[in-house]
């Protein structure tokens, strides 16, 4: 359900964006459910489960920087649908890789239909996004292709072993920029591109979008440790339990490699390597130690800087 824009947007802006976002939502739900009774349930599953719709909102917002007549036109609306379809497709694939039981408060697709069906459903949604983008012109098609490549490359860089000698923090930022920043950047660029805001504006909003993506993920790293389960709906330290080294842990490892890690940090890394994080008490202890260590504040500062 579409509510209001964040950050106390001016009423005049909301008056333009909200109806356009409602149109994007209607088109999105139509696109994910226009096949047949066999295909429609999995393809519509996550779209109907809701979501923030950050990417189409950004497309609609940056379109306001160009021709106001084009800013809520057919191409901009279809671009909003395409970026959200692409995002949703990656969620199907992510949940298979992560073996996630839930997504957006609903059972994940592979939990309901199995891994093969979930992967193919993601592929179908990418194909449908590509069909929409094909009508937006060659520049939009190329941008979508390059972005999807970056999404996949980011996932591969996260999945495969990091090359020896690679700075862990720099490597992680690259992963975040590819996995999350690239699609948000394209979402911002599409609005400016299709409303003919000009090349300079396209470049600015694209860079802005990528920085938002990296900052969002860094903030999520903080939230994973600093918030409570009542607020987020998940156990603090979930990433740690899944074996994911997020920024606070990477900062510890980098300091250790440089011979600059304090005793508290060394104790945390030791606990991570030897403790059973499936044990709630052990996980809670590691989370409590990380909350007190300066790396958490440093990660928060990095998110603000980005």
Model regions and ranges:
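All-alpha prenyltransferase/terpene-synthase fold signal
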Residues: 1-306
């Amino acid at each position: 359900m579409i509510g209001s824009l964040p950050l106390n947007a001016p009423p005049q802006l909301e008056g333009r964006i909200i109806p356009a976002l409602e149109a994007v939502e209607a088109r999105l739900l139509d696109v994910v459910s226009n096949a047949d009774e066999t295909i429609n349930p999995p393809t519509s599953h996550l779209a109907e489960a809701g979501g923030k719709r950050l990417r189409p909102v950004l497309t609609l917002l940056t379109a306001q920087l160009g021709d106001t007549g084009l800013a809520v036109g057919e191409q901009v609306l279809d671009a909003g649908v395409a970026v959200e379809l692409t995002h949703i497709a990656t969620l199907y694939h992510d949940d298979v890789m992560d073996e996630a039981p839930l997504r957006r408060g609903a059972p994940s697709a592979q939990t309901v239909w199995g891994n093969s069906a979930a992967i193919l459903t993601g592929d179908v949604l990418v194909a449908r996004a590509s069909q929409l983008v094909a009508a937006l012109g060659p520049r939009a098609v190329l941008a979508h292709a390059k972005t999807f490549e970056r999404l996949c490359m980011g996932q591969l860089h996260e999945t495969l072993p990091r090359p020896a000698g690679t700075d862990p923090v720099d490597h992680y930022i690259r992963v975040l920029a590819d996995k999350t920043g690239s699609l948000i950047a394209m979402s911002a660029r599409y609005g400016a591109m299709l409303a003919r805001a000009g090349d300079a504006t396209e470049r600015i909003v694209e860079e802005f979008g990528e920085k938002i993506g990296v900052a969002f993920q860094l903030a999520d790293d903080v939230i994973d440790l600093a918030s409570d389960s009542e607020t987020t709906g998940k156990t603090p330290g979930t990433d740690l339990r899944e074996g994911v080294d997020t920024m606070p842990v990477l900062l510890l490892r980098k300091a250790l490699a440089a011979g600059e890690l304090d005793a508290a940090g060394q104790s945390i890394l030791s606990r991570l390597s030897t403790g059973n994080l499936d044990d709630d008490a052990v996980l809670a202890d590691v989370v409590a130690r990380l909350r007190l260590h300066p790396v958490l504040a440093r990660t928060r500062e990095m998110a603000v800087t980005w």
